[in-house]
Amino acid sequence: MDSNTVSSFQVDCFLWHVRKRFADQELGDAPFLDRLRRDQKSLRGRGSTLGLDIETATRAGKQIVERILEEESDEALKMTIASVPASRYLTDMTFEEMSRDWFMLMPKQKVAGSLCIRMDQAIMDKNIILKANFSVIFDRLETLILLRAFTEEGAIVGEISPLPSLPGHTDEDVKNAIGVLIGGLEWNDNTVRVSETLQRFAWRSSNEDGRPPLPPKQKRKMARTIESEV
């Protein structure tokens, strides 16, 4: 196993522990708590994949961080912070919408890279909107936290979420996953539109209905992909 992979996991475990202590003092805002919950799932998945104990990794990560801090001057810290581009956290969904449990009458699921696409194929003839919480850097989607499809009545009928065991995805990965979700939902004559925030940062062009321009042929191909691969 690559030593950098192990040490990266150890540092991530310790930094998560620090953030958890911060949250336990009721100091974190909603985006902070949301990322904390998502990162916990990711660390569990990575720990299982690597065969590493999280508690042991956290202790090792603490030693690594302490060693770095001992060598770090205040001036170097200021320069590092100034050179790192700041990302923004954007929210279409409330915390309740993100944390709400939902179930599917006719579940369909597809894994696309490090993203999991789920939808209820029992839903027909509905008006559906896609909402997402994600971070943005350089005016482009950086990291998807969670995307969900809602009917006008507020029911959840679809979802795109990162796989905890496979961290890391690009804005193109997210765009392709959204295309698959839209294609699957539209296969049952649902009308799908996308939130303005997601339109702006997930891709640069959309039609007047608030969704990316997908030709009918591509929509049919995407829907068949879901049918054949699930």
Curated annotation (Swiss-Prot):
Record region (RNA-binding and homodimerization): 1-73
GO cellular component terms listed in the entry, alphabetical order: host cell cytoplasm; host cell nucleus
Motif (Nuclear localization signal): 34-38
Motif Nuclear export signal: chain residues: 137-146
Superkingdom, taxonomy of origin: Viruses
Region (CPSF4-binding): 180-215
PTM summary: Upon interferon induction, ISGylated via host HERC5; this results in the impairment of NS1 interaction with RNA targets due to its inability to form homodimers and to interact with host EIF2AK2/PKR.
Keywords, comma-separated and alphabetical: Eukaryotic host gene expression shutoff by virus, Host cytoplasm, Host gene expression shutoff by virus, Host mRNA suppression by virus, Host nucleus, Host-virus interaction, Inhibition of host innate immune response by virus, Inhibition of host interferon signaling pathway by virus, Inhibition of host PKR by virus, Inhibition of host pre-mRNA processing by virus, Inhibition of host RIG-I by virus, Inhibition of host RLR pathway by virus, Interferon antiviral system evasion, RNA-binding, Ubl conjugation, Viral immunoevasion
Region feature Disordered, mapped onto this chain: 205-230
Biological function: Inhibits post-transcriptional processing of cellular pre-mRNA, by binding and inhibiting two cellular proteins that are required for the 3'-end processing of cellular pre-mRNAs: the 30 kDa cleavage and polyadenylation specificity factor/CPSF4 and the poly(A)-binding protein 2/PABPN1. In turn, unprocessed 3' end pre-mRNAs accumulate in the host nucleus and are no longer exported to the cytoplasm. Cellular protein synthesis is thereby shut off very early after virus infection.
Protein name in UniProt: Non-structural protein 1
